[in-house]
């Protein structure tokens, strides 16, 4: 039953009118992990829990109460891309027609996995017409004395149902003499067929080893890819956040930023990106003097600096921990930016979320002086509900070493 708050809550605090005092307490105890959430029709929320080698899909009403009419049985759809094979969810996308696309990976190896996509009908049953798409390994066979690692895939669904699917691989030799990291970009039509004209695009930010973390589309249908490059300097890893822009046909848009690419001036890594209206907004983490900072940037559609955002400079927020992992970025209707993730301090992993104004200033009216350090746990995904403006997170609560409990969190905006 939905709980109701007696007094209004401050922005950034749990919204006690959502679910049970701000939390959807997902059945299954400590045996699952909430990996992704998306807003569905009528403001409902569909979320995916990774539990027992399956993807468990559930739906809640807009206020967080259960929706028993969703799914194949008792409000749940259990899914594996391949029978008796570990299926890990990464991202859930909602189509304009109400259907749902689940992006994830399949395989018995925790590091070398195949990218997989499937589609569900609006009621949560599998879309048998779409079926499932499982991509081959990007390097096959793997050369002797080498290891192949595949990152978690991500995607974007267009209004006409086309899917942009980003993945990649890291190939390295056992003796350390060879390392190659490449991002890959694919496109599928609304029926799930590969766009052969688009093909498979290799993404190498400025020609360097690269990893994709987000993909989105500008209003003119140009494709923006966000991630990180690693330009080794004197034998040392030197990662930095980067963007690439492509035409709708998949060709590099050399009018964007500098010859099609943008990269951070300083050491930075991890992060997420979202296109909002005609702006490219992204977060990353930086380490300055041994302290972890969250970095937030906003660019114009041509890749140039947006001088209306913090005078064109990166917003740097000291989180006073060694390591910061931004996992989600979402933009409210008032153009305020919500960034969330987790921090790590030796033996403690803590959820955080914060808000930056449209002008690029930490919103001190949000949570505690702009930042909420909520509880120990892990955060995977976040969105803003369109009608209510409520902020929603997919997260697990519990200590770094010990039982964690999967949740969907509702936060006052």
What is each residue range found by the language model?
Residues 1-413:
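Extracytoplasmic mature domains of secreted or surface-exposed proteins
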């Amino acid at each position: 039953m939905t709980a109701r708050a007696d007094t209004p809550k401050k922005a950034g605090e749990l919204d006690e009118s959502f679910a049970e005092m701000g939390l959807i307490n997902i059945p299954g105890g400590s045996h699952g992990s909430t990996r992704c959430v998306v807003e569905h029709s009528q403001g409902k929320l569909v979320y995916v829990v990774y539990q027992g080698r399956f993807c468990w899909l559930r739906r809640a009403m807009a206020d967080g109460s259960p929706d028993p009419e969703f799914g194949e049985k008792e409000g749940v759809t259990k899914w594996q891309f391949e029978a008796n094979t570990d299926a890990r969810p990464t991202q859930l996308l909602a189509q304009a027609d109400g259907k749902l696309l689940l992006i994830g990976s399949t395989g018995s190896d925790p590091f070398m996995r195949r990218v997989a996509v499937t589609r569900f009908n609006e009621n949560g049953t599998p879309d048998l017409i779409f079926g499932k798409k499982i991509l081959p390994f990007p390097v096959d066979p793997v050369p002797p004395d080498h290891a192949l690692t595949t990152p978690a895939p991500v995607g974007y669904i267009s209004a006409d149902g086309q899917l942009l699917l980003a993945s990649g691989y890291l190939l390295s030799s056992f003796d350390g003499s060879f390392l190659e990291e490449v991002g890959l970009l694919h496109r599928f039509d609304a029926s799930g067929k590969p766009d052969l004209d688009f093909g498979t695009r290799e993404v190498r930010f400025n020609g360097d080893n690269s990893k994709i973390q987000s993909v989105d589309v500008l209003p003119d249908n140009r494709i923006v890819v966000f991630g990180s490059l690693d330009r080794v300097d004197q034998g040392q890893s030197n990662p930095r956040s980067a963007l690439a822009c492509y035409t709708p046909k998949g060709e590099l848009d050399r009018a964007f930023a500098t010859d099609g690419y943008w990269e951070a001036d300083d050491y930075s890594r991890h992060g997420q990106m979202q296109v909002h209206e005609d702006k490219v907004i992204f977060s990353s983490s930086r380490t300055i003097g041994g302290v972890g900072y969250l970095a937030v940037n906003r660019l114009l559609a041509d890749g140039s600096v947006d001088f209306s955002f913090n005078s064109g400079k990166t917003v740097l927020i000291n989180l006073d921990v060694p390591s910061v992992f931004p996992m989600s970025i979402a933009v409210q209707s008032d153009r305020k930016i919500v960034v969330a993730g987790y921090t790590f301090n030796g033996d403690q992993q803590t959820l955080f979320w914060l808000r930056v104004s449209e002008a690029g200033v930490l919103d001190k009216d949000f949570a505690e002086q702009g930042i909420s350090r909520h509880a120990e746990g892990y955060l995977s995904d976040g969105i803003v509900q369109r009608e209510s403006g409520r902020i929603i997170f997919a997260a697990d609560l519990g200590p770094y070493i010990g039982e964690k409990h999967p949740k969907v969190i509702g936060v006052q905006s």
